[in-house]
Amino acid sequence: MVTERQNEILNLIIDIFTKTHEPVGSKALQDSINSSSATIRNDMAALEKQGLLEKAHTSSGRKPSVAGFQYFVKHSLSFDRLAENELYEVIKAFDHEFFNLEDILQQAADLLAKLSGCTVVALDVEPSRQRLTAFDIVVLSQHTALAVFTLDESNTITSQFMIPRNFLREDLDRLKALVQERFLGQTVLDIHYKIRTEIPQIIQRYFTTTDNVIHLFEHIFGDIFKENVIVSGKVGLLNFSDLKAYQFFDDSQKVAFEIRDSLAEDQMQSVRVADSRESCLSDLTIISSKFLIPYRGFGILAVIGPVNLDYQRVVSQVNVINRVLTMKLTDFYRYLSSNHYEVH
């Protein structure tokens, strides 16, 4: 069992070590701990025996172990602090007009990567929860067309496709009518289910020749089932991890699954220390935090860094960016839902 004084010593060692990355001796703690050097050494020995501290090879001092960082996160980390000293920089970074959601999320990820020195991932609302609110087909040439999807009245996705040889122009109109009749207002998850169950049963009502229609559906709808993953500071991974971790972030769908897996449905924040099931991330820390996207749901900001990062500083940075990001998104979606021509 960790005593109150031992917990104070562990917290202080973590604070010093994450700033200096040097082993900490008892003398460095005496100014902050109201105990003798011998007492502090005994407590450090007790913490080492419990696996929360470990010896350094090049010094007589001690450094936190992985278990020590995990204990700190569970018992001492404050999740509601704001990095007030960086608030002005964050507000200034968002103080201009954005033209789409992706640019706003990219700005948040870039800024957090810059402030934290870590790799950052930003995710939109989970695709399966988004609703199809508009659909159109634009003919590009004699043989190609573009399917245009609008999700949640704000997120536009396009899918270019080759018009099947047996398709007439009227068939494209029928395809558009079928989607608008059956899918508008439905969640992406429901659409995914209907393409596999309902659509094969009813396409003969719309098409005289049904060859390739199901394959065409699967092709043009494929992109709306995929996560839009924004990654910033990826090269920084190589400062504290290896090439396998770097390459992991090339697979955006695996990245999205890993980040979403780090947060339970009812969790707003999570800090996982060396706890990933992905072997290439198993010695890293993942700090995840949900942020509100008005009218639509929650996105996620995640920081991927070394185990020995300054947890309190990074969590505070995530909090302040989340707060300013939510304010910016509120303005953005308020504008989208307003009359464009109204006088302000």
From Swiss-Prot:
Keywords: Repressor, Stress response, Transcription, Transcription regulation. NCBIfam families: hrcA. One of its GO terms (biological process) is negative regulation of DNA-templated transcription. PANTHER family: HEAT-INDUCIBLE TRANSCRIPTION REPRESSOR HRCA. InterPro entries: GAF-like_dom_sf, HrcA, HrcA_C, WH-like_DNA-bd_sf, WH_DNA-bd_sf, WHTH_HrcA_DNA-bd, WHTH_transcript_rep_HrcA_IDD. Negative regulator of class I heat shock genes (grpE-dnaK-dnaJ and groELS operons). Prevents heat-shock induction of these operons. One of its GO terms (molecular function) is DNA binding. Pfam families: HrcA, HrcA_DNA-bdg. It comes from the Bacteria. Belongs to the HrcA family. This is Heat-inducible transcription repressor HrcA.
